[in-house]
Amino acid sequence: MAIISEDDFRHTSNSTYRTASSSLRADQEALLEKLLDRPPPSLQRPEDRFNGTYIIFFSLGIGGLLPWNFFVTAQEYWIFKLSNCSSPAAGEEPKDSDILNYFESYLAVASTVPSVLCLALNFLLVNRVPIRVRVLASLTVMLAIFIVMTVLVKVDTSSWTHSFFTITITCMAILSGTSTIFNSSVFGMTGSFPMRNSQALISGGAMGGTLSAVASLVDLAVASDVTDSTLAFFLTADIFLALCIGLYLLLPRLDYARYYMKPVWPTVFSGEEQLPQDSPSPTSVAPGSSDPQTPPLGPILKKTTGLGFCIIYLFFITSLIFPAICTNIESLSKGSGSPWSTKFFVPLTTFLLYNFADLCGRQVTAWIQVPGPRSKALPGLALLRTCFVPLFVFCNYQPRGHLHTVLFQSDVYPVLFTSLLGLSNGYLSTLALIYGPKIVPRELAEATGVVMTFYMGLGLVLGSACSALLVHLI
């Protein structure tokens, strides 16, 4: 191993960089395909006893998205709370009627804009603010926001509905931003761990969506008071966020996690020695960077361009279809009046089925990682998912203003298509996300994880924006 003078290094809060006049050669980087499966002889890698680290990352994945999912799932609650703005008394002029009519649009803006801004902010904070501070601060703010929303559930807001709307949108914006910082920070941290831990975090996010869909179905079946069910939703989120704080504080106490969270030795990639995938994140030499506090964005973008395209396009197609198109596909036997074809059709065939299929696709990557990060099959499969757009459009989407043809005359088709949409999204997006931090020098793993989540956010924003146009064309 090459010896480097301390004078050649620049230290930051999370990583150690050395100024270099030229970037590292491709064959000198720790590429995923060439990584060894065992640690160097001088280090003994602890075992993940009882899969404790895996379970913690899985739980953090749930906690990162469960509050947001519950926030969005409580549609009936928002209608109940905001209906006073849109239902004036007899003889009165409608006041602020757009609050209820366009509430979901306001919610989407309050969700996406802060997410993109906070992703960029988090990249700049990677080496300025310790990850422990970022994670705990974001979790604490998320918990505080949900405590406020939980308290307001049983408060009569009929006399100040407009103020309640303002508070709700503000809380959603803060929640979305802090959730983004939390998720991208933890995902960046898993870049220094073996891939199964990144997979656990991503699968946990899908489990959060599945749990919220199940909760929504239970609420429909029980038909309880809307405020009671929402109170149960929000209290569950409060408890889980508090649990996530405890789990994150527990993480460094596990030998296995501590092994990967602490740098062990300064090193340079020499081309003759490759650090194994299962070795801890070392204090390494980074490609040239003029600011030791800011990770070099250029090399990260260069190495992750292909994977970034896959992530953006995968989530673009997914958010183009789900939920805007999926939720408007009706059962062909809707006229029968059965609960399956009316009350439960969309919650079952759209939300629960998609989230469960997405979870299954993500979980499969724990055992199978094909195709690889350099394979042309990965972007090819991402592009192939474009076929889902016409498949869903020609199901029984209603109402139809321009395209009146319904080709798929059975309820089996939307069930099949939604399952394939979720499976392909879960499997392919997880592969692309977990590959990213593994194809760059190890000291850039955390920053690369943040960039990968930015790709995901960009795809979601583009898809959501274009879904409105697609709905208009139908």
Swiss-Prot record:
Residues 75-105, 156-161, 223-230, 327-339, 398-414 are extracellular. It is found in: Lysosome membrane; Late endosome membrane; Mitochondrion membrane; Cell membrane. The record marks D219, E446 as: Important for acidic pH-dependent nucleoside transporter activity. Acts as a pH sensor. It catalyses: adenosine(in) = adenosine(out); guanosine(in) = guanosine(out); inosine(in) = inosine(out); uridine(out) = uridine(in). InterPro entries: Eqnu_transpt. GO terms for biological process: adenosine transport; cytidine transport; dopamine transport; guanine transmembrane transport; inosine transport; norepinephrine transport; nucleobase transport; nucleoside transmembrane transport. One of its GO terms (molecular function) is nucleobase transmembrane transporter activity. Residues 276-292 have a biased composition (Polar residues). It is a multi-pass membrane protein. Residues 272-294 are annotated as: Disordered. Residues 1-53, 127-134, 183-201, 252-305, 358-376, 436-453 are cytoplasmic. GO terms for cellular component: Golgi apparatus; late endosome membrane; lysosomal membrane; mitochondrial membrane; plasma membrane. A motif (Dileucine internalization motif) lies at residues 31-32. The chain crosses the membrane at residues 54-74, 106-126, 135-155, 162-182, 202-222, 231-251, 306-326, 340-357, 377-397, 415-435, 454-474. It comes from the Eukaryota. Glycans are attached at N84. The modification Phosphoserine is found at S21, S23. Keywords: Cell membrane, Endosome, Glycoprotein, Lysosome, Membrane, Mitochondrion, Phosphoprotein, Transmembrane, Transmembrane helix, Transport. Belongs to the SLC29A/ENT transporter (TC 2.A.57) family. Contains a N-terminal dileucine motif (DE)XXXL(LI) important for endosomal/lysosomal and mitochondrial subcellular localization. This is Equilibrative nucleoside transporter 3. The gene is SLC29A3.
